[in-house]
Amino acid sequence: MKSHAEVVIIGAGVIGTSIAWHLAKAGCHDVVILERSHICSGSSSKGVGGFRQQFNTEIDVRLSQITLPILLEMAEEIDLHQNGYMYLALNEQEWQQIQARAKRQQAWNVPVELLSTDEVAYRWDFLNTSDVYGAAYCAKDGLSRPALATAAFAKRAQALGVEIVENAEVIAFERNVSDDRIEAVQTSQGRISANKVVIAAGPQSGAVGSLAGIDLPVKPMRRQAFHTGPSQAAASTAPLTIDETTGFHFRPDGDGQLFAMSNNEPLGEENLTVDLEFGARVLGFAKHRLPQLSIEKIATGRAGFYEMTPDAHPVLGAIPGVEGLYCACGFSGHGFMHSGATGILMAELLTSGTTSTLDISPFAITRFAEGKLLGDGAVL
């Protein structure tokens, strides 16, 4: 590991590697990523892997729209398929809400369409639509693999001179008390000084922030996903489909299906055990929605973390009062689908002091103390 870098990034997940690549593309090649384990060893390796433009706030939509072309350029490399995303309304109130939401999204240039129950049944005849009132569907949304995207970002960054140091856990920060500037990072592999440091450590970002002396309200929350064995090939064409009422959702995954659902997990607990009792509950929803697939059991399960903030939106930008310290974390389950935009925006900020692609001031850390929390983060 070198002793100094212009920019040190903490975390080699999909966000950290994207920032590094975009920095190098912008001409800043003196970048080091510090990773406590190995590239993509954390949340980026566990995600369901959907990407969508169907959000409740315009700024989230814009992050997805900026990211999508970047992902499409790497489509084959990251196993990207535009199967779409579909939200199913299971009662009249939800159907009214989905229609209103789709109208807003269309005004933000999201190519979302509203489908009747009959249209859903015709397009995807393996779905049980007996309780469906209608759906919102965007064909440009779809599926990918965040681990492959992380590897692709990392490879491109390294080709432009970025150094990625694995097994380098951050243990302390050095701050100059005279001007309150971050001067260096102490790691399990030694010390590295830097002009700028970016915390992009996913669910561990809050803990890393504490080492730097800041209150960064990012906490891990367990999310689980369950995989079936081989199922009928027709389901491979399915969009990532969400039951609006329960949050149950599924996507094609290899020769089977991947199911997930919120379980009201506590914040801050680093528990990665798989709850098979919860898996059985999820399986019940899967059997109801996909009766033709004759799904009898779960083959495997996995657990990872969302990196949650109080308003389920990220913290992006400089940290006031600590010169040279920046954050790009707290994506609350949306890191992969906003990774490209985050790389662009943070590269702009780090090289020029401002962003030109999109105003990121709504994501400032100061919003929590000022009571300026953002709207519904549309977390699945």
Question: In which residue ranges do the predicted regions lie?
Answer:
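Flavin (FAD/FMN) cofactor-binding and adjacent substrate-gating region
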Residues: L72-E73, L90-L160, V165-E166, A172-R181, ...
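Glycine-rich FAD pyrophosphate-binding loop
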Residues: A24-S44
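Active-site substrate-recognition segment that forms the wall
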Residues: W21-K25, V48-R52, Q65, E73-G84, ...
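C-terminal catalytic lobe of FAD-dependent flavoproteins
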Residues: K287-L380
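Core beta-strand elements of the Rossmann-like FAD/NAD(P) dinucleotide-binding domain
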Residues: S3-A5, Q186-K196
